[in-house]
Regions:
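Conserved ABC transporter NBD signature motif
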Residues: 60-71, 75-76
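Conserved ABC ATPase "signature" region
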Residues: 81, 100, 104, 111-129
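Catalytic Walker B motif of ABC-type/P-loop ATPase nucleotide-binding domains
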Residues: 158-162
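Short, charged/small-residue-rich alpha-helical element at the C-terminal edge
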Residues: 222-295
Length: 295
């Protein structure tokens, strides 16, 4: 596979008169976890649908595993797996039956299907629930089964569209460990998420899009440092943040920011200083707030 698992140049897509993606340039190195952040309606799902061959682009170049999406779509499909926002499993069947059925549909023999099913059940911590109907599974178990199904045939690139939406903290962190293990196996993971902590914890590279355009790309550390060295917060008596400002961290800059922040405020309000977070990055880049993961 190419050193770049995914590359887009000037990617554009519109529906009717609405421009959804407007000149997206991305480079996803092979073997990395790459996170796409953006508010609702930013174009995340449309982009992942194009990259996974579900939609055609209107303009631009898209290469997946070195293959041009416009001319080598069949080869692209043989290089990717996709797990969407909603679990695509048969709730009447057991977890084992779901996996074995997909193995057979993928062309594996009965013996190969049995072996691959057992392997995936172990890897995704579903062996104990293998013979239980999926309708009895928790949300986290369903998501793990859904990802396992997408990996029945081993492919170098996995697309995950908001994989932990709706999961509780324990299930979400369990899935994070599985995603990190997939990276260790050499799989490139391209995920979209609404959760800033998820991108911060998992991603080697993060791209932020807003209104169909890339507004920033970098590591979590570089994105945080790009907005300043320290963040000043002013809190009221109820411990609510009433004002905030990112600063370079120098005494001169912090004094100036404090003077501006504290104008016309009660002297009883408290000041705190912290390092920038992904929340600060996102708000600075998009003027919107992302959804916080449930705790």
């Amino acid at each position: 596979m190419s050193k770049l698992a995914i590359e887009t140049i000037g990617l554009r897509k519109k529906f009717g008169n609405q421009v959804v993606l407007d000149g997206i340039d991305m480079q996803v190195p092979a073997g990395t976890i790459y996170a796409l952040l953006g508010p609702n309606g930013a174009g995340k799902t449309t982009l992942i649908h194009i990259l996974s061959t579900l939609y055609d682009q209107d303009d631009g170049i898209v290469k997946i595993a070195g293959y041009d999406l416009a001319t080598d779509k069949d080869m692209v499909r043989q290089s990717i797996s996709l797990t969407g926002q909603f679990a695509a499993v048969d709730e009447v069947l057991t977890g084992e039956e779901n996996l074995r059925m997909l193995c057979r549909l993928s062309g594996l023999t009965a013996a190969e299907s049995r072996s691959r099913t057992e392997e995936l059940l172990r890897h995704f911590d579903l062996a104990a629930a293998a013979k239980k109907r999926v309708k009895t599974y928790s949300g986290g178990m369903r998501r793990r089964l859904d990802i396992a199904i997408s990996l029945v045939v081993k492919r170098p690139i996995l697309f995950l569209d908001e994989p932990t939406t709706g999961l509780d903290t324990i299930s979400r962190r369990s899935l994070w460990q599985i995603i990190l293990q997939l990276k260790e196996q050499g799989i490139t993971v391209f995920l979209t998420t609404q959760y800033l902590e998820e991108a911060d914890q998992l991603a080697d590279i993060i791209t932020v899009i807003d209104s169909g355009r890339v507004v920033a790309t970098g590591t979590a550390k570089s994105l945080k440092s790009s907005i300043g060295g320290e963040v000043i917060e002013i809190r009221n008596e109820k411990d609510e943040i009433v004002r905030t400002a990112a600063t370079s961290g120098t005494l001169l800059d912090m004094n100036q920011a404090l003077n501006e922040l504290t104008q016309s405020l009660s002297p009883t309000m408290r000041v705190s200083i912290r390092k920038p977070s992904m929340d600060d990055v996102f708000i600075a880049l998009t003027s919107q707030e992302m959804e916080r993961a449930p705790s």
